[in-house]
């Protein structure tokens, strides 16, 4: 006998009957074919997709299932992350050989194009006791030779505040979009998430806290026109901290970028901060806290 191909992939059921007319006997088997699980192809449409994409990047495995025909990772709609109780950033950082020119080494950074297509990643909460955690807290831990564009984090009605408690390890970076960006472009991105740093930053230990991007090397934030500019609309604030240093060992807090490293190519174009920046630290700025090398255009 022949069973026709299931072209729709829908669940279907049937009965197979075996009979012997000579002895007047028969037997039947009920069969059910479950619906085909369609693999996500061409973009990210659910929180599970985004979590699995992050795992793929962090494991160094293929991300092709989330790429469109142009090879971009794309959001197909707004993504609700309320079901995700513990987020692991996409990519990570190592600060073992920290210098002001090369602050971090990327670990499995995202290296392609991530196009939000104007959609939002909503209800992403990275609140944590950071005492014994990693160094990176954000959507991306690290990007390198990458483009991130047309992406919204949260929305105008968000009530989410990232509550960061404990004592921050040296070189911790907290930034909703990307903690560390090297040789990359970030354009057309907006953040609405708030950051409340109730943790302590120990004296003389560099930490970076930003409403959008933490630390950059040879990276452009904002495009070549106002339409491609980036903005932060969430507040960034800290309580009293032990670190009152004013310099490279101080706490860096800003609305757009906390630390522009001592390397050529850093640029901020058409960036705007609308969020309240309230931080009793040595290096605080509405746009950037420390600019060691680079340019800002508006």
Regions found by a protein language model. Name each.
Residues 10-21:
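A short beta-strand micro-motif common to beta-rich folds, especially ectodomain repeats
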Residues 23-36:
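C-terminal edge beta-strand
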Residues 4-10:
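Short, surface-exposed loop/turn segments at beta-strand-coil junctions that are enriched for proline
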Residues 37-298:
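Surface-exposed repetitive/solenoidal architectures
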């Amino acid at each position: 006998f022949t069973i026709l191909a299931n072209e729709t992939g829908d669940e279907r059921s049937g009965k197979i009957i075996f009979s012997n007319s000579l002895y007047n006997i028969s037997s039947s088997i009920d069969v059910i074919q479950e619906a085909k699980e369609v693999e996500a192809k061409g973009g990210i449409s659910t929180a599970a997709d985004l979590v699995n994409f992050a795992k793929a990047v962090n494991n160094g495995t293929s991300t092709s299932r989330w790429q469109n025909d142009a090879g971009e990772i794309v959001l197909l709609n707004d993504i609700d992350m309320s079901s995700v109780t513990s987020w692991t950033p996409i990519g990570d950082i190592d600060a073992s050989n920290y210098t002001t020119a090369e602050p971090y080494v990327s670990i499995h950074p995202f290296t392609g194009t991530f196009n939000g297509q104007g959609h939002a990643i909503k209800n992403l909460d990275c609140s944590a006791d950071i005492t014994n955690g990693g160094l990176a807290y954000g959507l991306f831990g690290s990007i390198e030779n990458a483009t991130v564009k047309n992406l919204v984090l949260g929305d105008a009605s968000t009530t989410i505040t990232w509550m960061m408690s404990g004592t921050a390890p040296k070189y911790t970076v907290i930034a909703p979009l990307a903690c560390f960006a090297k040789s990359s472009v970030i354009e057309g991105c907006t953040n609405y998430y708030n950051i409340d740093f109730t943790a302590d930053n120990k004296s003389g230990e560099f930490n970076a806290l930003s409403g959008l991007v933490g630390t950059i090397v040879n990276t452009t934030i904002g495009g070549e026109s106002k339409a491609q500019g980036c903005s932060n609309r969430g507040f960034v604030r800290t309580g009293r901290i032990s670190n009152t240093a004013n310099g490279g060992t101080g706490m860096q807090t800003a609305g757009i970028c906390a630390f522009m490293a001592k390397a050529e190519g850093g640029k901020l174009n058409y960036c705007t901060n609308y969020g309240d920046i309230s931080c009793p630290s040595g290096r605080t700025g509405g746009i950037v806290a420390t600019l060691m090398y680079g340019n800002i255009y508006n």
